Amino acid sequence: MSAQGHRLTAPVNSEKVYIVLGLSFALVSITFLLSRNSLPHVGDNIHSLPHGGAYRDGTKAILYNSPNLGSRVSLHNGKNAAFAAVLLLTLLIYGSKYISQRNHTCACGNNHSSH
C-alpha cells in the first residue's frame, strides 16, 4: 500500500447539533414550565372551579374566589424559578461566547484565539 492511499481527515464537527439540541431542550422546558396548571383543585368529582366561581344545588354549595393572577404562572414555585434562572443564565453565558467570538489581536501582534 502506498502512503497516499491513507489520508487523515478532520473529525466531523458536531457542535451545531449540540447547539440545536440544547436550544430545543431549553424551549421545551420553558414551554412546559409556563403552560402547566398548578392551580389547586377546587370542587368535587363533577364540579371543578379552578378559576373561582360559585355552584349551588339542593344539597351543597360551593363558593370559591379566584386565586390571584400571579399563582397562574408556575414560575412562582421556588423549584421552577430556580430551574428557570439556571437555564436562562446558562443560555446567556453560552450565547455570549458565540457573540463575542472575534479575532482578538494582542498588543504583541499575534492572534491568540483558541480556534
Curated annotation (Swiss-Prot):
Signal peptide: none annotated. Its main location: host cell. Plays a role in viral cell-to-cell propagation, by facilitating genome transport to neighboring plant cells through plasmosdesmata,. It comes from the Viruses. GO terms for biological process: transport of virus in host, cell to cell. Keywords: Host endoplasmic reticulum, Host membrane, Membrane, Transmembrane, Transmembrane helix, Transport, Viral movement protein. The keyword Transport applies. Residues 1-13, 96-115 are cytoplasmic. Residues 35-74 are lumenal. Belongs to the Tymovirales TGBp2 protein family. TGBp1, TGBp2 and TGBp3 seem to act together for cell-to-cell propagation. TGBp1 is the main movement protein that physically cross the plasmodesma with the viral genome. TGBp2 and TGBp3 would facilitate TGBp1 function. This is Movement protein TGB2. The chain crosses the membrane at residues 14-34, 75-95. It is found in: Host endoplasmic reticulum membrane. GO terms for cellular component: host cell endoplasmic reticulum membrane; membrane. InterPro entries: Plant_vir_prot.
